[in-house]
Swiss-Prot record:
Annotated RNase H type-2 domain residues: 9-196
Pfam families (alphabetical): RNase_HII
Name this polypeptide is given: Ribonuclease HII
Function description: Endonuclease that specifically degrades the RNA of RNA-DNA hybrids.
Cofactor: Mn(2+); Mg(2+)
Catalytic activity: Endonucleolytic cleavage to 5'-phosphomonoester
Protein's gene: rnhB
GO CC field: cytoplasm; ribonuclease H2 complex
A GO term, aspect molecular function: RNA-DNA hybrid ribonuclease activity
Keyword Nucleus on entry: no
Source species of the chain: Proteus mirabilis (strain HI4320)
Enzyme class (EC, first level): hydrolase
Main location: cytoplasm
């Protein structure tokens, strides 16, 4: 399936990583690519090996016209809910760009509240290079944060499962309780904290 780009001079792609995990921030990225400096091999970050993702992460940061990361921490996720916290994080990523785009393409079926034109693109991380680039920046950023969190809390296995509710993570949550970085509004964490 071919994506037909809207008519615009400066297009930013936006994607998020980390809506499903029980721990840590939801991380978003916004990227404006440089047509004069193409990047080969951009695709949905989930379809790339970690090695390839890391290489592309460096290349995107080097070659893009501009890029920015936006985030929402667990406290904000618990206060707003994951959907609205994700929208806020996307707004922060776009606001953080050093060049203002005239069009923003967002992965998924909903756009955040932006001061410029925007369009949601289902499967955008596979169809739109700018969104693929954003998905890679967001994923590598979040994965590295989970590796850091793993050093603080080595028993939970964060470096491996990245905070997603795997059987191992659920087992540790039940036996060790929640860390301060867990999302207290998420049902499995609520259960572990006896908040249900």
């Amino acid at each position: 399936m071919e994506f037909v780009y809207p008519k615009a001079n400066l297009i930013a792609g936006v994607d998020e990583v980390g809506r499903g995990p029980l721990v840590g921030a939801v991380v978003t990225a916004a990227v404006i690519l440089d047509p004069a400096n193409p990047i080969q091999g951009l695709m949905d970050s989930k379809k790339l090996t970690e090695k390839k993702r890391n290489a592309l992460y460096d290349e995107i940061k080097e070659k893009a016209l501009c890029w920015a990361i936006g985030r929402a921490e667990p406290e904000e996720i618990d206060k707003l809910n994951i959907l609205w916290a994700t929208m806020k994080a996307m707004e922060r990523a776009v606001a953080g760009l050093s060049i203002t785009p005239d069009m923003v393409l967002v992965d998924g079926n909903r756009c955040p509240n932006l001061p410029m034109a925007s369009q949601a693109v289902i499967k955008g991380d596979s169809l739109v290079q700018e969104i693929s680039a954003a998905s890679i920046l967001a994923k590598v950023t979040r994965d590295r944060e989970m590796e850091q969190l793993d050093k603080l809390y080595p028993d939970y296995g964060f470096a491996k499962h990245k905070g997603y509710p795997t059987a191992f993570h659920m087992e540790k949550l039940a036996s060790l309780g929640a860390t301060p970085y867990h999302r207290k509004s998420f049902a499995p964490v609520k259960r572990a904290l006896n908040l249900v």
